Regions:
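Iron-associated oxidoreductase/ferritin-like identity signal
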Residues: 1-187
Length: 187
């Protein structure tokens, strides 16, 4: 039978070895997982999409307010603020990776200012594009074991899916009641 001091010493050595093994696994994962160029590129794409949406939606809210559609302007302004938050989440994650995410590519909107249907369709298309990029980012991040990025993207994806529902419901309402009646409700 071994003395207690010797047993405690052996147990301490085993625990120390386990801790060292776990630390080396974590360090290896950190080096591998946080250098995925695919995840970083997808985050940049997501940032660009959300920044484009922020810019377009803010302009739309200003136009709608000026045209007297205060209810619709409030919804669009709220959506613009949400998209701005999504862009900020992407920036925070890209900053974590210490990567250059400039310049952002923001192109002019493709909707005509006074064409309400084109504006809503444009918003729907851009939200669908955001959802696609967010899904791809989640998949790519999980493939390399980057659960932090994947988990960060889930609320963004949920927000985009809510946006899809919103703009699809607007198009459905317009189809059912006509554009003039829809706009009358937005005053």
């Amino acid at each position: 039978m071994k003395p207690i001091a010797e047993l405690l010493n052996e147990q301490e050595q085993e625990i120390t070895q386990e801790i060292k093994t776990e630390q080396s696994v974590v360090e290896a994962q950190t080096v591998e997982n946080y250098s995925s160029s695919q995840v970083i590129e997808l985050l940049k794409q997501s940032l660009n999409v959300h920044w484009q949406q922020t810019t377009s939606l803010t302009a739309q809210a200003v136009h709608l307010e000026r045209w007297g559609y205060k209810k619709l302007a409030a919804v669009i302004r709220e959506d613009a603020e949400e998209e701005h938050q999504h862009a900020m989440e992407n920036i925070k994650r890209l900053e974590f990776f210490d990567t250059d995410y400039q310049p952002l590519t923001v192109s002019p909107p493709v909707w005509t200012r006074h064409d309400m249907l084109a504006m809503i369709r444009y918003n729907l298309d851009s939200v669908k594009q955001a959802a696609e990029v967010e899904k791809a980012t989640i998949v790519a991040a999980r493939m390399v074991g980057d659960e932090l990025t994947a988990n960060m993207m889930i609320p963004l994806l949920q927000g985009s899916e809510n946006g899809i529902k919103l703009y699809e419901s607007y198009l459905k309402l317009i189809e059912q009641m006509g554009l003039d009646n829809f706009l009358t409700l937005q005053v």
